[in-house]
């Protein structure tokens, strides 16, 4: 029993030493500890909150208590038909999600001027499983929101790391 406990502890140390992180966790700089999210749709906010929690980052309740403020200005979801069947039904769609944002520090200084993040995905529309397609589209949209959040966080990381080296 003691050998098993020792093995578990040693294995845990090896995992952390090699840089292993749980899925969804991001390695973020110290400057990104308390973040306030201003704006955004419910789905975007849910994904943002999930990514922050997985990365051990606190979401501040107000901008006054935040080290960083992420302003979401505009979100746009589009769906475009890419191909049609011989009967005229849509076979393939392209989903497009665009979000505009900027990042401020705790003193309202602009760290990242207004930028746009664009995520696109295609998916096949099986005419035999119409109900399942709605669920598939919602799942894909959730993944698109998550990809956008990760892209925004990556841009923030680059800005914080470059300002730390100055």
Feature-to-residue mapping (PLM):
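Acidic, polar-rich low-complexity tracts and alpha-helical solenoid repeat scaffolds
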Residues: 23-26
